């Protein structure tokens, strides 16, 4: 009886492999695989792909289990909020740049020395006359 077990193991494996091949040849869907595009799921009852958008109206349909969670709704205010925030940042940057420029310009008036004695290009005689 102990010698029958090793001989029957290959037979069981071959039988199991044959069943898998027959199931694949019959066209049945293996669990976890789907020939459907995104947004749709395979219905075993109807034997075709069904749109997941109909699941809120009929949540107990067999294909709704294959649909992912409801897709997130589009946030319609995203672009106006993003545009407003970027505009605010731009305005604040311009105002702060103007204030810094104005402050530096006020200090700049007294930092430029005025040449009172003349230079090499201006003789001292010309200053006296």
From Swiss-Prot:
Classification via Pfam families: stn_TNFRSF12A
Main location: membrane
Membrane association type: Single-pass type I membrane protein
Membrane topology, Cytoplasmic segments: 102-129
Transmembrane segment boundaries: 81-101
Localization in the cell: Membrane
Known function: Receptor for TNFSF12/TWEAK. Weak inducer of apoptosis in some cell types. Promotes angiogenesis and the proliferation of endothelial cells. May modulate cellular adhesion to matrix proteins.
Induction context: By FGF-1.
Protein name per the record: Tumor necrosis factor receptor superfamily member 12A
Reported tissue expression: Highly expressed in fetal heart, intestine, kidney, liver, lung and skin, and in adult heart and ovary. Intermediate expression in adult kidney, lung and skin.
Signal peptide: 1-27
UniProt entry keywords in alphabetical sequence: Angiogenesis, Apoptosis, Cell adhesion, Developmental protein, Differentiation, Disulfide bond, Membrane, Receptor, Signal, Transmembrane, Transmembrane helix
PANTHER family: TUMOR NECROSIS FACTOR RECEPTOR SUPERFAMILY MEMBER 12A (PTHR32037:SF2)
Assembly and interaction partners: Associates with TRAF1 and TRAF2, and probably also with TRAF3.
């Amino acid at each position: 009886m102990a010698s029958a077990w090793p001989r029957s193991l290959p037979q069981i494996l071959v039988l199991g492999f044959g069943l898998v091949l027959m199931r694949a040849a019959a066209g049945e869907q293996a669990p976890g695989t789907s020939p459907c595009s995104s947004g749709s799921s395979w219905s075993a009852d109807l034997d075709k792909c069904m749109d997941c958008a109909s699941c809120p109206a009929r949540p107990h349909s067999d294909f709704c289990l294959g649909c992912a969670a409801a897709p997130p709704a589009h946030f319609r205010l995203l672009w106006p909020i993003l545009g407003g925030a970027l505009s605010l940042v731009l305005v604040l940057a311009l105002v702060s740049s103007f204030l810094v420029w104005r402050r530096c310009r006020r200090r700049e008036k007294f930092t430029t020395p005025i040449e009172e004695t003349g230079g090499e290009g201006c003789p001292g005689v010309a200053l006296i006359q």
